[in-house]
């Protein structure tokens, strides 16, 4: 059976729901959990103006701190759920525009033998059957992937829009 399960999250309600189910599976079979959050790279290609003056962009260090803070907020309920079930929980955060690649990389690096992920995250119903990240992970991974299919009625009607962490 599985000994170490990777559960990626993007902080969306759907990814969080899938991660919680992955933690429940780990609890039932006595596995560890590795939680991964991959944030988009800081995109400073466009200027935003306020009162006719360009707004300041975060430095690389500020952006990394903001990403780590956001990741901790996303992972805290997952960590608490794992700890309540006596499941060993570790986490990693990456900054990259290749989310699927880093999910697979983290699973391999941490010796995971299962990736348990949502069928979609913040992209919502953009890809009707399965989200783009889930599809790419399935295509790239040599490790088994369990895709948690969210039922249509479970999708929030007015989901919050995700915005990359900014200072």
Write out the residue ranges for each language-model feature.
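Glycine-rich, Arg-bearing micro-motifs that act as flexible, cationic patches
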Residues: 114-140, 154-156
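Structural beta-alpha unit
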Residues: 80-115, 152-156, 161-167
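Short, well-ordered secondary-structure micro-motifs
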Residues: 18, 45-48, 101-104, 128, ...
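Small/aliphatic-rich secondary-structure junction motif
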Residues: 3-57, 81-85, 90, 153, ...
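A short acidic, glycine-rich active-site loop
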Residues: 55-73
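Short, solvent-exposed amphipathic alpha-helices that sit
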Residues: 21, 67-78, 102-104
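Generic structural signal for helix capping and beta-alpha/helix-loop junctions
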Residues: 42-43, 99, 124, 155
């Amino acid at each position: 059976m599985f000994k170490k399960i990777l559960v990626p999250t993007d902080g969306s309600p759907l990814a969080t729901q899938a991660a919680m189910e992955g933690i429940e599976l780990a609890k039932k079979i006595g596995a560890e959990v590795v939680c991964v959050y991959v944030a988009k790279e800081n995109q400073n290609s466009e200027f935003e103006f306020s009162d006719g003056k360009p707004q300041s962009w975060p430095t690389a260090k500020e952006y990394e701190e903001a990403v780590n803070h956001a990741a901790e907020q996303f992972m805290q309920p997952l960590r608490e759920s794992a700890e309540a079930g006596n499941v060993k929980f570790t986490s990693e955060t990456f900054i990259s525009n290749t989310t699927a690649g880093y999910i697979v990389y983290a699973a391999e690096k941490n010796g995971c033998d299962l990736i348990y992920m949502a069928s979609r995250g913040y992209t919502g119903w953009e890809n009707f059957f399965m989200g783009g990240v889930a599809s790419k992970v399935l295509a790239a991974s040599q490790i088994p992937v369990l895709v948690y299919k969210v039922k249509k009625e479970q999708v929030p009607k007015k989901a919050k829009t995700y915005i990359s962490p900014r200072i």
